[in-house]
């Protein structure tokens, strides 16, 4: 029997952090909002910017730049907050420099990073798109790490 290639098309929201392009699985994205006043929370992690009130819902907001130890935040007119609502977890916002178009990437055009690779923690792979290469974020791992840090801080 011939090998059947997995030709499933996945959709990602294309975002920019500095000069780097990333993709966020569209199934996690609940909303994209303009940058607004973020209320700081005392004694929080450096990458935790604070909380916002979005239509009556208090949402924690993190800086992906700080989480990935990139250059400091440079909020500008194109900065946005990506509101993510993963299954069975609390809603969270990530500040990004820019939000681009929806990227359609075939499963066969994704080079997955091996689990032994240190980069694999927050990146699931690299997608090949007509507009260039895109690092695909592992949102589940990002949120799991955040929850683990909260638990450790509580103990």
Label each PLM-derived region with a short phrase.
Residues 1-155:
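An acidic, low-aromatic, low-complexity terminal/linker signal
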